[in-house]
Structure formats: structure tokens, C-alpha cells
Amino acid sequence: NAVNIKPQIHENYDGQKIILDEKDNIVLDPTEFPDLLNLKGQTLITSDGHTLLGVDDKAGITGALAMLKYLTEHPEIEHGDVFVAFGPDEEIGCGGQYFDPADFPNVEFAYTLDNGRPGDFEYDTFNASEITIHIKGTVVHPGEAYGLMVNATTLMNDFLSNLPQDQVPEKSRNHDGYFLVLHAQSNVDHADISMIIRDFDQSEYNRKEQFIRDLVKKMNKKYGNRFTVNIREQYENIYNYIKDKPYIVNLALDAYRKSGLKPNVQSFRGGTDGNFISPKGIPTPNLFNGGGNYHGRYEYVTVEQIDKLAEVLTNIVTEHLRQTRTGRNEKPLEKYW
């Protein structure tokens, strides 16, 4: 949970185990989380092991504010207009729901600061849909059920067994998509299934949606119109809005290199607020916030990584002004997957 968070500061981290709570034997161990070994000598921040830390996205907020503070304290640094927005509901998929581009006049593009190590950069995310399926059974006394009862649980099991068993999260990686059954409950009278589909590729994503529609049609033909389905598209891959605007990507990568970072361009197996902001006319790829082990008791971040984020943001602002004057880096994007 996020109540009573008690941050712990570990200066000059030595790469060894960190006992978050000795009594409850809660330990942050680099043998379990080897990325910690890359943080030796840095100032590590953790929780006390009983809550999450909230790095996602307190680290991003801190980096953005540090950039604003730096620019404010150094008026000699030339830059254009800079807008910063904080969306409190990103983790429940509503962070960009009430984002109004009219509040950000003349903004050409933006960046989210959502997870990732320094150097990570993402402009390719999932397409996403959530699906609900309702199945209607017929209840009859079991002793008189022959030829009459239709058990919704049996129908549900038949539907689930027809889903692709090799296209699930635990068997997917890189640019693979998947089907995921989140919840299924049933009795004889009715059954309900909640699931999601994810895919980077638009055509594969469309095929997954159509597969569900066809499977429902098949089940209805087999059992007599007892299945209803509702498919709600949640968000679209931001690549669709960025692929023809290479400057947005190149500017960030130029700023990374200027900050001494080696860019690590990758696909993001999820979504960000950029998935909701990009369709509103402001293409928004994702940078990083520097944390690790998000959403759990073993979350961490370092002061140095947040500082690096602030440096990158400052360099994006100043580099944008420079390239606007001297010529933009419009090098075409290359597929990296």
C-alpha cells in the first residue's frame, strides 16, 4: 500500500544486502535484484519494506521539478516555453483522460517520465483492449436435468480451452502480444469472463480482437446464442503517432548522448499517459524515471539517477532551441525490433 511510507536513505551504497526490516526478515538482496550492483557508490532510497516507495512516479515528478528549478535559477540559459503536467491517475489508466491540449497552447510534442533506467527510451507501446464475456446457462433440478440443463460453467470452460495457449504473458516477450484472462467466475446459471488483449502490431492486434469475436460466434452456434461479448479498446500504440515525426525521438536521443548516456531504445510492454495524450495531437514518447522494482516493497531509486533525469530534461529543452535555430535532426527512424 501507499500509506505511511517511510523512505530509507542509504548513502554510498556498497552493493551488499540491505535489511529493510530485521524483525520480519525483509531484505533487498542484489542476488535477487542484480541491477542493484550497478548502483554502487550512489545514494539509494528504499522504503522500510512494509509499503511501496512510490518511485513510479515520484521520481519522474522530482526530476521534472529539478529541471524547472535549475532553469529558474539560471536565467542565462535560453529556452522556449516549457510546460509540465502531473497526471495523478496513470496507474489506473485515467492519467490522460482529462488532459486538455487547450491548456498547453502551441505545444508540439511532450515526453512522459514513466519507469525505466537512465538511457531507456520508448516510442512503441501496446495496442490494448479489455473484453468482457457473459454466458447464460439454464438451471434445472439435477435430478431432472437430462436434456434440459445448460451449465454455464461447462460452457465457460469450453471457451477458455479454445483460447491460444501459447499466446499468454508467461510465454510472451520482446514484440509478442498476448491474451490474458484476468478473472472468471461461474455457476450453473451464468458465467462471466474478464480478459485483455495486447499487441504492438496493429494487424496482429486486430486479428486478436477478431479471434475473440469468431470464437464467440462459434460458441453461440454450438450452444445456441448463450454468449455475449463486449470489446472496449483502451489505448493505441503511440508509434502510430510518432513514426512520421522522427525529430521528437532524435531530439531526446541527442539529449541522452549530451548527458553521457547510451540510448537504449526498446518497446514498452505496457502503456503510458502518452497513449492517451498522443491521439489528442501531442505526440508523447516515454523517457525514464530511474527507479527499479516498481509497485512493491522492494522499490528503489537513487538520487544520482533522478539528477540524471533532470539533466536530460534540461538538455532536451536547450537542444530543442539550438536545433530550432540551426536545423532539426530529422533522421528517419529505424525499426529496432
Cite the ranges covered by each PLM segment.
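Zn-dependent metallopeptidase/amidohydrolase metal-coordination segment
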Residues: 187-189, 262-320, 329
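Acidic/His- and Gly-rich active-site-bordering loop/insert found
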Residues: 1-45
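Phosphate/diphosphate-binding glycine-rich loops and adjacent basic-rich segments that engage nucleotide
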Residues: 112-145, 149-154
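Active-site-adjacent substrate-binding region
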Residues: 154-171, 178-180, 226-227, 236-285
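Acidic/histidine-rich catalytic neighborhood of metal-dependent amide-processing enzymes
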Residues: 37-126, 168-172, 176-178, 182, ...
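Acidic-enriched catalytic cores of C-N bond-cleaving enzymes acting on peptides and small amides
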Residues: 123, 145-184, 203-228
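Short, hydrophobic beta-strand segments
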Residues: 133-135, 191-199, 231-238
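Glycine/charged-rich beta-loop-alpha catalytic/anionic-binding loops adjacent to active sites
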Residues: 37-51, 136-140, 259, 291-295
